[in-house]
Amino acid sequence: MQTCRRRKASGGQSTIKWSRMCLATLCGLLLLGIQIERAASAPAGEDAAATTMPPLDTTTDAPDAVAATTTPATTAAEQSSSISSITTEAADGSTTSTTTTTEAANKSNATETDFTTNVPVASSLPEETSVRSTSIEPITSTEPTTTPRQETEGPDQHMVFSNTEPDQSHIQHIPLRDEHAESSGADDATTEMQRQREQDQQQNELNQISNEQDDVVKDLNNFRHPATLITASNSNSEENVEIESDKQVETTTTAVPAAATSTSTEATGTPPTGTPATSTSTVPNEREEDPYHVHILSENHDRLAEHEDYQMLSTSTEESSTTSTTSTTNSTTESGIVAGIVVSQENKATAEPSTATESTSISTSTTTAATAATSTTSRARAMHMNDPEDEAATTIMPDSESVPVINIVEGQHMLQQEDQKDEEEEGVVKESESSSTTEASTTTTEPSPFVAFAGEGRSAGGGNDIELFLHHNGSTHEQLMDLSDVSMDGDQNEGSSKTESSTTSTTTTTAQPETEMPKIVEITASGDTMQRECLANNKSYKHGELMERDCDERCTCNRGDWMCEPRCRGLSYPRGSQRSMANPNCLEKMVEEDECCRVMECSEPQLEPTVVATEGAAPSTNGTGESAVTLPTTDDEATPKPRTDCHYNSGVYKFRERLEIGCEQICHCAEGGVMDCRPRCPERNHTRLDKCVYVKDPKDVCCQLELCDVTLDDHEQQPTPLQSNNNEDPEEIDPFRFQEQARDAGGAKPTCTFKGAEYDVGQQFRDGCDQLCICNEQGIHCAKLECPSNFGLDVQDPHCIRWEPVPADFKPSPPNCCPESMRCVDNGTCSYQGVQIENWSPVPANLTGCDQHCYCENGRVECRAACPPVPALPPADLPCHPALARLLPIPDDECCKHWMCAPQIPKIGGAGQDEETEATSTHSSIPANETTTTTATANKSTSIPSKVPQIKKDEEKRPPASGAFYPTLDGKPPKSIGGLGIFEKPEKPEKAHKKVQHQQQQHQQQEQQEQQQHQNDVIFDGDRTEEQEEPLPPNGGFVPFQFGQQHPHQPHLGPYGFYNPVKPVYEDYNPYEPYDINPNGTPQGKPPPVPTSQSDLFNILGAEQPGHPVHPGHGGPPRIHPGQTQKDNHNLGPQVRIEQILQHLQQTVPGGPPPPPPHQQHQSLTPQLHPQQQQISQQHPGHYVPIVHSGVPPPPPGHGIAIVDGQTVAYESYPVIPGLGVPQHHPQQHQTTPQQHLQQTILPSSSTTSGLSTQASEHSLHQNQGKLAKQQQSGANNLQPDIEVHTLEAIDPRSIRIVFTVPQVYVNLHGRVELRYSNGPSNDTSTWEQQIFAPPEDLIATSQMEFDLPSLEPNSLYKVKITLILRDLNSQPTSSIYTVKTPPERTITPPPPFPDYRPDFQDIFKNVEDPELTVSETNASWLQLTWKKLGDDQMEYVDGVQLRYKELTGMIYSSTPLIHRTLTSYTIQNLQPDTGYEIGLYYIPLAGHGAELRAGHMIKVRTAQKVDVYGFDVTVNVTKVKTQSVEISWNGVPYPEDKFVHIYRAIYQSDAGKEDSSVFKVAKRDSTTGTLIMDLKPGTKYRLWLEMYLTNGNTKKSNVVNFITKPGGPATPGKTGKLLTAGTDQPVGDYYGPLVVVSVIAALAIMSTLALLLIITRRRVHQTASITPPRKSDAAYDNPSYKVEIQQETMNL
C-alpha cells in the first residue's frame, strides 16, 4: 500500500496505472482469501489431515470447462479446527436424522458429516474375515438435487443398484486393500414408514440448500493441489444438468445430519485438533502412513457418477412389488441387515461421490424424497488403501445373507445411458444419516448387492454391468467378483427403461443442454502403488503393461487394476463380425494399425449401420419418459457406450451378432438394441440382357451372380460389380477397386482407382495393350483387347501354323496396339525329295518305297518302318500246322509279308452235281484269311479268297472275315457295339410250295458230314461253366437246333438262315484283363486268334423243315432236300427280300399241322424223326445250304448251292478253298463242328462280321420260339411286321442297344418310339416297363433308328417290343416280341494255358552267357566298365542296358541312364575316392515284355585314392652368406612352377628384430629357384623360411633355416620389405663417375651421328634424278596382313 501511495504521490499517468494495478491485485487477493476460506470447509478432516493434505479440488457445473488451481498445502491447515469443532458439535446435537440435519444446516458451511456403515461380506470371499471399512466425507461442492437415475430390471430380477443417493462431490478418498477394490453393499431397508419419514426429513433439508456459494465454487475450481499429476480428456458425459447445477454449495452443513457427524467423530476417533485416529487406536497414525492422495477433477460425468457411489454406500435398497425404492441408512450397529462403511477422516476429501446422473453437486445434508423405479447403479472412486486393523475396529460383520458383488471400475460407467432417463423420472431419495448408536431404521425385502470398487473412476454395477465390466473394463479381482448370484440376463433390458409410480414427493429440476466437458484427473501415487501388478489368466503384469483380449479389448495395467478399451475404434470393427454380409457391394479391408480390426470399403452408397462412429460416446437424458439418446463424440478416450442386446422375433441377440433369416435377409445387432436387417442378396437387374447369365455365388449358396459379356454396348451396364473378363476373386482387393469418397464436408465425386491411378466415372482408359477399361458407378470394367487383324486367320489359311504381323518388327504400344495385317510364315508343308507335301499328310509310297512310311507333320517328315516285324518262326496261334505256314504278302500291301497258312485250291463242281467230299470239306475249310468287304452303298458282298487284309499288331489275334453275308435289307452289316446279348427274328409261316424232298436230301447230306467230322470236333455249351467233350453226331457234325426244350449239350441259335449281327462283347472291357474261357479253349467275349479250320463257318445256317427235324443225338441244322432244281446263280431275282428268305426258313409241311409250342415240339418230334434221320444220313451226305438275297453275290458254299427265293441255286464260278490246318487227304479234318459254327457266330472276324452270343442264344432262341409259333398260327399270310429289328444286343451288363427300321411310309412323319420291356414272366405288354424315345423334333427322319436302353439288370432275359406312336395318325406300327439277355457282371477268371510253349523274356535270357562285366580303368572319382555285346537273336528283345551300383556299406542302388543295347562300355562319374562299390548289369526289356533281368553276377571294385597335386614339400637352403646379404635356394616344387605356385615369399627374422621382413618373387616357368636377400645386419642370427601362395588359393610353408651373417662394418640403409627379384639388386656405390663417362660418350655419339647425316645429305644433292621412276615393289602391298595393317593405321588416323 505504501508503494502505491508513493507512486500516487508522484502523480501523472503512471500513478493512475499503478493504482489500477494495485486495486486489481487487492481484489485478486481478496477473492483468493475468500476461496481459501470456502475451501477450508470443503474437505472434512482434522488438523493433521489439513496439515498433510491440501484442500481438494472441486468442479463446477459449467458445461464448458472445469478450472482447477492449486494452492499451497498450508492453506488447508486453517480448516481443520473449525471443521472438527463443528463436527463434534453436530455430533452432540441429536441422534436422529431430522435433528441432525437441522442442526447441521444452522451451522456454517464448514460442517461436514461422517457416514459410517457396516459392509456385509459376500459369501464368495472366504479369505475375508472382516468387512472393509471405508470412510466417506462430504466436500464443499454442493449441487441442486435431481431425480435419481433408475435402472430397469425385469420383474424377476434383482435390483442391482437401487440406492437413491444424496448428491455429493465427486472427490473421494476411499481406502482400499491390496485388490485395489472394495466391496460394499447397501443397507437393507426396514419399513416403508420409516423410509417415508426419512425422505420427508431429507426434503426439508433439501429446501435449506443455500445457493450462495456460486462464486466460491467457481474460485474453488481454480484451487488445486500443487503436487498432483494432471491428466485431461474430453468426455461426453451426462451434460443435461439442472439449472441449479452451476451453483455448487461449498459446504455441507445444511445437508449433513448431525448424527452422521457425531458418528464420524466417534467412529474414527477424531479429536478436535484434527488428529486422525481410529476407535481402537490400533493405527493412530494412519494419516501419516497414507502414501499418496489422489485428486480427481472431472466433468459432470465423473462427479455425478461418484455421487451415485456415495449414495450406494450411504443408503440401502428396497424393491417393492411395482417400484424399487431405495434409501440409505448409515449406522455402526451390529444389525445383520445394515451394511456400514466407515470413512476415515483423512479420506473424506475424496470419499464423497456425486450424483452420476444429473451432473449436480448437492450437499450431503440435502435429501430428496423420491421413489426409485429401478435400482440405481453407482460408481465409486477408491484411492487409498485401508488397513485391516482399522476395518476391524469400525466394522461389524453382518449376519445377513450374502449378496452379489458388483465391480465398480474407476473412470467409466457402463450403464449411464439407460439410467439417465430413469433418474429424471424419480426423485432423489436422501436419507439422513443415523448416529453410531442408532439401529438401522430401514430394511429391504431382498438383499442388496455389494459394490466392489475396482479401480479409479469406473464402475460396473449390478448384473448389467458385470459382463460389460468383464469385456470392456477388464478388472479381474477374484475376491470381489462373486458372480454366482448375479443374473447375466440383465443386459437384455438395458435398452428399455420403465417409469414406475412414485409415492413420495420429488424435487425436480431443469437439466441444462448437453455439452462436452474436459475431464481432468489428478493422481498422486506413491512408488509402492505404482508397482502393483495385475493378474490375468494366471499371469502377472507390471504397471503399464498391455494385454490384448483376443480382438475385443486392449487393457493396460494401472496399479493393480486393468484399464481396458476396445481395440477397434471409429468405423473399424473386430474381425469376424461379418459386417460385409450386410452389403454385398462392400469389401472388407484390414486396418493397418491393428490386424484384428476391419473396415468396410464400398463400391456404392451403402446404408450406414446404426453404429456409433466413436467408442467414447456418453449418454444423456433429455427429459423424463424419453429413451436414452446416443450421441457421438470425438473423444476416443471417453467411456465406451453400452452395447445393448437386440430383441428380435422372440430372440435375444448380442451386440454385433449375425442372424440369417433364410435366404431373404441378414441382420446384425447394432448399437442401441436395433436390429439392422438388409437383403441377403443384391437386387437383380430386372432388365437384364440376353448376354447376361446368373450363376451361383461361391460365397453364398442363396445368392446368384450375374455374369455378362464384356463386349457391352454404350447403353448397357453390367449389374454385378467387379465381374468382367478378369478372373479376379471378388474377395481379393484387386487393383481396380471402386472407392467411394466420403460424403461429409466436401461431397467429393466418386472415382475409380486402377493400378494407383484415379479415374472419373464414365472415363475410358487403356490398361496398356492388354485391355480397355471404363469407370462407372459399379467399379472398373475391363475387356480384353482383340485386334481385328487377328480375326478370321483360320479362314484365310487353315493350314497356317505361325503368323507374324506386318511389319515383322511391330511392337504394340498404346494407342497403336494392333498391327495392320498378318501374314503366314509357316503353313507346315514339307519338302521330300523335291516334292511339297501338305501338312498332316502322308508321303506317297512311290517316293518312300517299301522300306518306310513317312508323314509330314509341322514342316518335318517323320518316317517309320513300313512293315511290322516278322518273327523268325511262325506264330503259335496260326490255324494250321507250322510246317504248312508260309510268308505271304499281306493283302492290299505288296511290300509287307506275314505268316499265314498256305492256301489249297479245291475242285469246283458243276451245276447239279453233288460233290459231297468237296462240299463238306469246303464247308469246314473256308480260309482264315478270307474277308468280306461290305460297302455302304451297294447291296453286295465281295469275297476275296486269295488275299488277307493287313493285320496290325493289335489285330493279329482277330479272325479274318469268313465271307459273311448279312441278311439285312441292304445287305450291309448293321451298326452294333459288341455285346453278349442276341436277338431273334420271329418265325414266319413257310410257303406251301416248298418240297419235303429237298429237305430230306439235305438232311442226308448233313448227317454224312456229321459222321465224318465226329472224331475231330468238340461239343460245347456256351452258357455252361463246365467243360465237357462228348462224341459228335455223324454226318458232318452239324448240330440241329431244337425248338423245344434245350438239349444240355447243344447250343441254340436264332431262326434258320437268320444272322444275328452281334459284336463279341461290350468294348469297354480291357483286353489285357483275364477273361472267360469257353470249353474249347477260345476266350469268350474276346476276339480270338486267327481262327482255326474248326472255326471257319458261314454266317448262314441251313434250312430245315420244322416238321422233319433231325435227331437230337445226331444233331444237325435243318436241311432242304435237293429235289428242287438248282439254277445258275448269276441271274437272280431283283426283288429278293429278307422276309421271303425267313418265310422259307420257317415254312411248315404242306397240309401238316402247325408247329406245337417249343417244349411240346421238342418232346414230340424227337422220337419220331430218329429212324428217319439215320436212313437219310446213310443215303445222302450232308450239304450246307446258304440262303441269300437275290442279286447279291453270296459266299462260296461247300457244295455250290444255296436257297434263293425258295429255289436251290448253284454257284459254280466261286472256288471253294479247303481248310489249311489239316491235310486234304483226311476228309474228316475238313469238317466243321456245330461248336465251330457257334464260335464263328459268337466270335466275329476282324471288322466286317459280328457273331452271336451263345450265352444269350441259349435262352433267347429257346424262349422266343413259343411266341413265334403263336404268330405263325395266327398270321400265316402276314409277310412282315411293321417294325423290323436288325440289332438287339447287350452293350454292357445293364444296357442294350436296339437298331430297327420302320416302314418307309412313316418316314418324315411326327412320332415317338415306345419301348416296352420286361424280364418277368408276364406276357401282358401293358404291364411291362415303358420307355419313350423321342427323335429330334419328334420327326422320323429316317427309316432306320437306333436307341440304347439303360438301367437293366445283369444276367437277365428281357422281352422287348417296339411300338411307333404317331402324332396325327391312329396307326401304331409295332414289332414282334424279341428277347435279349444281358450278360452277367464281369467275372475275372485266370487265362487259359496256351497249348504251346512261348518263352518270355526271363526264359529267353535264362541261359544267356555271362556278359563278363569288368572294370577297364579306374580313378579316384570314376570307373570305366566294359561288358560283352549281346547276340543278335537276343538283342531284339532288349530295349537297353543299365548299370546299377551302390557303396558296399550303402543300401540303395543308383542307376545309370538307359544305355543303348549295342554299347559295351560306360563310365560312372562322381564316385567317392577310395570307396568300394558293388556294380551289376541289367537288361531292360521292351515295354510289356516282362521284367528286367540282371546279367551275370555283381562285381565289387574300389576306386583309387585321391591324389593331391599340391601335396609337395619345399626345402629351403642357404647357399652364400655375406655380411649384409644371403643367397637362398629351394627345391621340391613340381614342374612347371607357375602351374602350382603364384608367388614365393621369403620371410626372415632376426633375433633382435620384432618384425618380419620378406622378399617376394613371382613364380615363372624355367626360372631359377632362388633369390638374394639384402639389407641384413652383419654378425646377426636370422631365421628364414619360404611361404608359397598356391594356385588353388592355399598357402604352403617350407622348413625354417637359421643362419648368421658374417661380421663386418655397419649396415647401410636397406630396402627390406620391397619387392626384389634375384640379380636385380646391386650394392650401392659412387655412381657419379660412371655417370660422367656415360654422358661424354653419349655426346660424342650424337655429334658423330649429326656429321654423318650432313655428309649423306650433301652427296644426294649433287645426284641427278632418274629418268624412269623406280619400280614399285608390290610384294609387301600384296601381303594381306600388310594391307590390314595399313588400313588400320589409315583408319586410326
UniProtKB/Swiss-Prot annotation:
Residues in compartment: Extracellular: 42-1635
UniProt GO MF annotations: integrin binding; signaling receptor activity; signaling receptor binding; structural molecule activity
Domain of life: Eukaryota
Membrane topology: Single-pass type I membrane protein
Domain VWFC: 663-708, 828-902
Transmembrane segments: 1636-1656
All copies of domain Fibronectin type-III, residue ranges: 1281-1385, 1407-1506, 1512-1608
InterPro entries assigned to the protein according to its UniProt record, in alphabetical order: CCN, FN3_dom, FN3_sf, Ig-like_fold, VWF_dom
Location, primary (coarse class): membrane
Biased composition (Basic and acidic residues): 167-182
Tissue specificity as recorded in UniProt: Expressed in most, if not all, ectodermal tissues which produce a cuticle.
Compositional bias segments (type: Polar residues): 619-633, 919-930, 1262-1277
Cytoplasmic compartment spans: 1657-1693
Low complexity composition-biased segments: 70-113, 133-148, 250-284, 314-335, 350-380, 434-448, 496-510, 998-1015, 1035-1055, 1106-1123, 1160-1180, 1223-1257
GO cellular component: apical plasma membrane; extracellular exosome; extracellular space; plasma membrane
Signal peptide bounds: 1-41
Keyword Nucleotide-binding attached: no
Glycosylation sites per record: 106, 109, 330, 473, 538, 622, 685, 827, 846, 929, 939, 1323, 1419, 1517
Span list, region Disordered: 70-205, 230-286, 311-384, 416-459, 486-515, 616-642, 910-1056, 1070-1131, 1147-1180, 1222-1277
Compartments, as annotated in UniProt: Apical cell membrane
Gene Ontology biological process terms from the UniProt entry: axon guidance; cell adhesion; cell-cell signaling via exosome; instar larval development; positive regulation of cell differentiation
Protein keywords: Cell membrane, Developmental protein, Glycoprotein, Membrane, Receptor, Repeat, Signal, Transmembrane, Transmembrane helix
Written domain comment of the UniProt record: The extracellular domain is sufficent for conferring apical characteristics on the salivary gland membrane.
Function: Vital for larval development. During salivary tube elongation, possibly modulates cellular adhesion between the apical surface and apical extracellular matrix, and acts as an apical membrane determinant that functions in apical membrane expansion independently of crb and Cad99C.
PANTHER family, per database record: CONNECTIVE TISSUE GROWTH FACTOR-RELATED
The protein's name: Putative epidermal cell surface receptor
Organism name: Drosophila melanogaster (Fruit fly)
